[in-house]
From Swiss-Prot:
Locations listed in the record: Cell membrane; Postsynaptic density; Synapse
Lineage, uppermost ranks: Eukaryota, Metazoa, Chordata, Craniata, Vertebrata
Name of this chain's protein: Disks large-associated protein 1
Phosphothreonine: residues carrying this PTM: T579, T606
Pfam families noted in UniProt: GKAP
Family: Belongs to the SAPAP family.
PANTHER family the record matches: DISKS LARGE-ASSOCIATED PROTEIN 1, DISKS LARGE-ASSOCIATED PROTEIN DAP SAP90/PSD-95-ASSOCIATED PROTEIN
Domain of life: Eukaryota
Region Disordered: start-end pairs: 150-209, 355-376, 914-980
Length: 992
């Protein structure tokens, strides 16, 4: 009798009628055709032991609300009372069992609409159901249901599905079919007739009736079902469903139930039930039934235990729990809104362990009364798999001290996972293999959810998972229904897309070992790259389950001293993505990362290799292998990736020492965040939620970038060279204003945001060998310092300075550094002009230099600032690229050099105590004969100065041409570079 409906779920009590011996008096009753005028007086033998409710229970039978049959439920205006006992005469049930189906239909059609007499067990559904069970009670109910389900099916297994444990006689095959609620025409027509009769009165609350309590031999033995609720009491939701069964129990009922192996119900007999009784809590119950006795009751052949009690108990949960989303037509045999369509008698069959076998063709069909041999074999293997759990559960005493978490621990989550080889042979059972195998995402998670959700629901108050448990316990082979309820649990069983894990293992399997070796600098902490699976299941019925899934790197932010790099890797990760990548691109909070480390080998149900995963994996691998991710800390927010870059104030000597030994290539995924130059020396986390893209973030910004043709925005990579760094650091040491100059070398993490658009994008982060002289980063060098005589620049330095491929942030910082330097010069010269009594020619030079600098800052610097802001504005049209900014900056350098030369001359004059020329030099100039040489006296130094200035300009032009050549060579050789990180992301990556 697997077909008990949901509304019948509220009676689990031991039969409380004292007149158990009076059953023989009514064995001669015709079970269906009693007179409608039988008013069931108070001295009726079935109602001899009523309580104080009895006077209110009896009502006129013309009233449809009161015209229920035995056992009935009466509803008063003050409080709705439940007057049910599951006691049905065994002889009467046996007679009803043997009646043919067509005769049952005739009996039902002959009945009036008042449906009086002993026709069937009728239960009234309230119009507005108050579903107020607490989650703790729900967990308790679910745990009870799970154990009943496990035991009943373990008894079914050896007898090939017979509910009577091997005693299924030919007589009872019809009962078996009825218990299964098969899709036969008789049952459907009968249910339809019942539905039409039940819903004839639209004003009254809907009635439903079922003959299933009269179907089998076990109707007398509904009592174990009430006992094996394991100490539950009908608390809050049962305020309108007080059970007479508990307060009218007598010694005879206890004796009758002790024939079922001494089930003790002492506390049930003392339970006070009155109209004003307070709601009973679980602490008021102390059932002395142990699970071992429950198993004996189940295994006793006279009990004839089958699925009806599992159904009756679990359907109470379905009735009282408002979270169940399973359609009522699938659960109960009635239509709640009185529609005339056919009542679906098919249940969601309770063999979800067959679902767990992953068998698509599912050898057990609804219409077949006997399961196939395949299903029988599966049930036997299921019995083997679950027997250790049952054995351990026999020692567990269920009382008010045991919480559901404690009760379920004995067949724990791991055992449920490891014993789920139901459609596979037991010898091939390997829990690790099951967990890591992509084939594991078959239907065996249905059973595993049934075993594991109960243990996990106490940790997670996700009421939707209760729905998954009920579906798993009571559904048989409903592929569509189970798939609709296919909720991913934190166990993360599905292993569909592990290619990113394999790619990481192939591409950077050495990283975790090599990082600690390469990070050999004493200040650095050991940096490890971990792949962390974060998942939060958003439970949505009959829709796609959204699961946040990502790979983040979990590491500490180290000091900025770069480690020593021995080799440069070639990392190429090609990630074929599925179309589900949009919902995976979000990351969970950082709080989950610590406890999710244990699941790092698992993936979610909607796991796919989207761009975030592949790019993060490859880029973090590159970080770890090239220099360790010294400059960034990958965090995760709800919709963005944040990067913390540590820019510490390191002395120039330390930098010079480190940069001579190292080349630091750091690539990261980050978001836009503008940082002021004053804060460049401190760690700062960028928290703006903008479009997340792939781009290269350089630790000390001694790099250069390249852009692939297929990428819409620049994906940048850097190179730095120690010889070039030496020169730049020497110039910094000799610089008179080392503060803003040193600031140019400390680049923060806020590089531009690069969106991933289109499919088939290639991102190249390229590096070159040391002998590739044309690939130098120009922006690492300070602006030209012609006022310092000790600096002599070679063409390579010119190339390095000229080529610049930065974004707007970087050029704004350079521009600010130049402005600060020039303003410092202007203030210095103006102060010298005020403090010293200088000759007019020197004053003229000072005013010329200061005016030129101010004009340059007011005009060209302002124009360049606007260009940088347009570059940072994604809506600007036309939007200057980084290469445009680099070219404009190179032209700006020429003007900066001219002004620098003027200030250099002023510095020389100041060093000479503001004296114009050395007298010795003047004497040498006057040495030629006076008459022919007089016209050339004055302009001679001027001509020499102009020639020097023109030579400087020619050198600057040469540097600019060399820079352009280097840029073209670098772009052509980007893909043929000696070291590259290539990430190929095809398909479905346009939704970031």
């Amino acid at each position: 009798m697997k077909g008990l409906s949901g509304s019948r779920s509220h009676h689990h009590g031991i039969t409380c009628e004292a007149a158990c011996d009076s059953l023989s008096h009514h064995s001669d009753h015709k079970p269906y055709l009693l007179s409608p005028v039988d008013h069931h007086p108070a001295d009726h033998p079935y109602y001899t032991q009523r309580n104080s409710f009895q006077a209110e229970c009896v009502g006129p039978f013309s009233d449809p609300l009161a015209s229920s049959t035995f056992p009935r439920r009466h509803y008063t205006s003050q409080q709705e009372l439940k007057d049910e006992s599951a006691l049905v005469p065994r002889t009467l049930a046996t007679k009803a069992n043997r009646l043919p189906t067509n005769l049952l239909d005739q009996f039902e059609r002959q009945l009036p609409l008042s449906r009086d007499g002993y026709h069937t067990l009728q239960y009234k559904r309230t119009a507005v159901e108050h579903r107020s069970d607490s989650p703790g009670r729900i967990r308790h109910l679910v745990h009870s249901v799970q154990k009943l389900f496990t035991k009943s099916h373990s008894l079914e297994g050896p007898s090939k599905g017979s509910v009577n444990g091997g005693k299924a006689s030919p007589d009872e095959s019809q009962t078996l079919r009825y218990g299964k609620r098969s899709k036969s025409k008789e049952r459907r027509s009968e249910s339809k007739a019942r539905s039409n009769a039940s819903n004839a009165s639209p004003t009254s609350p809907s009635w439903w009736s079922s003959d299933d309590n009269l179907d089998g031999d076990m109707c007398l033995y509904h009592t174990p079902s009430g006992v094996m609720t394991m100490g539950r009491c009908p608390d809050r939701s049962a305020s309108q469903y007080f059970m007479e069964a508990y307060n009218t129990i007598s010694e005879q009922a206890v004796k009758a139930s002790r024939s079922n192996n001494d089930i003790k119900c002492s506390t049930c007999a003392n339970l006070p039930v009155t109209l004003d009784a307070p709601l009973l809590k679980k602490s008021a119950w102390s059932s002395t039934l142990t699970v071992s006795r429950a198993r004996e009751v189940y295994q006793k052949a006279s009990v004839n235990m089958d699925q009806a009690m599992v159904k009756s108990e679990a359907c109470q949960q379905e009735r009282s729990c408002q979270y169940l989303q399973v359609p009522q037509d699938e659960w109960s045999g009635y239509t709640p809104r009185g529609k005339d369509d056919e009542i679906p008698c098919r249940r969601m069959r309770s063999g979800s362990y067959i679902k767990a076998m992953g068998d698509e063709d599912s050898g057990d069909s609804d219409t077949s009364p006997k399961p196939s041999p395949k299903v029988a074999a599966r049930r036997e293997s299921y019995l083997k798999a679950t027997q250790p759990s049952l054995t351990e559960l026999t020692t567990l005493k269920i009382s008010n001290e045991h919480s559901p978490k404690l009760q379920i621990r004995s067949h724990s989550y791991l055992r449920a996972v490891s014993e789920v080889s139901i459609n596979r042979s037991l010898d091939s059972l390997d829990p690790a293999g099951l967990l890591t195998s992509p084939k594991f995402r078959s239907r065996n998670e249905s059973y595993m959810r049934a075993m594991s959700t109960i243990s996990q629901v106490s940790e997670m108050e996700v009421n939707g998972q209760f729905e998954s448990v009920c579906e798993s316990v009571f559904s048989e082979l409903e592929s569509q229904a189970v798939e609709a309820l296919d909720l991913p649990l934190p166990g993360c069983f599905r292993m569909r897309s592990h290619s990113y894990v394999r790619a990481i293992e192939k591409g950077c399997s050495q990283d975790d070992e090599c990082v600690s070796l390469r990070s050999s600098s004493p200040p650095r902490t050991t940096t490890t790259v971990r792949t962390i699976q974060s998942s939060t299941g958003v439970i949505k019925l009959s829709s796609a389950v959204e699961v946040s899934s990502c790979i983040t790197t979990y590491k500490k932010t180290p000091p900025p001293v770069p480690p020593r790099t021995t080799t440069k890797p070639f990392i190429s990760i090609t990630a074929q993505s599925s179309t589900e990548s949009a919902q995976d691109a979000y990351m969970d909070g950082q709080g989950q990362r610590g406890d999710m480390i244990s699941q790092s080998g698992l993936s979610n149900s909607t796991e796919s290799l989207d761009s975030m995963k592949a790019l993060t994996a490859a880029i973090e691998a590159a970080n770890a292998q090239i220099h360790g991710p010294a400059s960034q800390h990958m965090g995760s927010n709800a919709a963005a990736v944040t990067t913390t870059t540590t820019i510490a104030t390191v002395t120039t000597e330390d930098r010079k020492k480190d940069f001579k030994k190292n080349r630091c290539l750091s690539i990261g995924i980050q978001v836009d965040d503008a940082e002021e130059p004053e804060k460049m020396a401190e760690s700062k986390t960028s928290n703006k939620f903008q479009s997340v893209g792939v781009q290269v973030e350089e630790e000390k910004c001694f790099r250069r970038f390249t852009r692939s043709n297929s990428v819409t925005t620049a994906v940048q990579a850097d190179l730095d060279f120690h010889d070039n760094l030496e020169n730049s650091l020497e110039s910094i040491e000799d610089n008179s204003c080392p503060g803003p100059m040193a600031r140019q070398f400390s680049r923060d993490a806020s590089t531009s945001t690069v969106s991933i658009q289109g499919s088939g994008n290639h991102y190249h982060a390229c590096a070159a060998d040391d002998d590739f002289d044309t690939d130098f980063d120009p922006s690492i060098l300070p602006p030209p310092d012609p006022w310092i005589d000790s600096i002599t620049e070679d063409p390579l330095e010119a190339v390095q300075r000229s080529v610049c491929h930065r974004d707007g942030h970087w050029f704004l910082k350079l521009l600010q550094a130049e402005r600060d330097r020039m303003e410092g010069w202007c203030k210095l010269m103006e102060r010298e002009e005020r403090e010293n009594n200088l000759p007019e020619d020197i004053l003229g030079k000072i005013r010329t230099a200061v005016g030129s600098a101010q004009l340059l800052m007011a005009q060209k610097f302002y124009q360049f600032r606007e260009l940088c802001e347009e570059n940072l504005n994604p809506n600007a049209h036309p939007r200057p690229t980084s290469q445009d900014l680099a070219g404009f900056w190179d032209m700006l350098q020429l003007s900066i050099e001219n002004i620098s030369m003027k200030f250099d001359e002023l510095h020389q004059l100041k060093a000479n105590n503001w004296k114009q020329m050395d007298p010795l030099d003047k004497k040498e100039r006057r040495a030629p004969p006076p008459v022919p040489k007089k016209p050339a006296k004055g302009p001679a130094p001027l001509i020499r100065e102009r020639s020097l200035e023109s030579s400087q300009r020619q050198e600057a032009r040469k540097r600019l041409m060399a820079a352009k050549r280097a840029a073209s060579v670098r772009q052509n050789s980007a893909t043929e570079s000696a070291e590259s990180i290539e990430i190929y992301i095809p398909e479905a990556q346009t939704r970031l």
